[in-house]
């Protein structure tokens, strides 16, 4: 709602039951969502489809790139989930990320575009005929609840951690600057 353009590319392998949420996100005028190498069939038939066409569906995308304005990119092993960002009270994955700027960010953007524009990257809406789309109202309500929960969790966090600019300024001197080269596989 702030005019920011968002493109979200997700691998389809472990996303059963989330199509309503994805379509709801994709319905926002500034958000585009694509699935990489989708299984085709949705619901219970998805698993059977995978078993029958395993060679085709074994080609997955494991890239993680968070790119802002083509100027800075965060890359690493984190998936999208509370447990990857210290927000899950019962489980927390420890992972490493790298922040790249300049030419490295440009290369990260090119890598993202390579996968975004690949024939295996499919807009979520293309998986459903107009008459068979999931109900987006319930998904929208679920997103509102999730956003409210996130606000509550973040409000409990240390105020310094929420002030990103101050945090970046305070950690700038401890960053390690090095040359970069972004390498990805082919889509």
Map each language-model feature to its residues.
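Charged, low-complexity intrinsically disordered terminal segments
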Residues: 1-64, 68-187
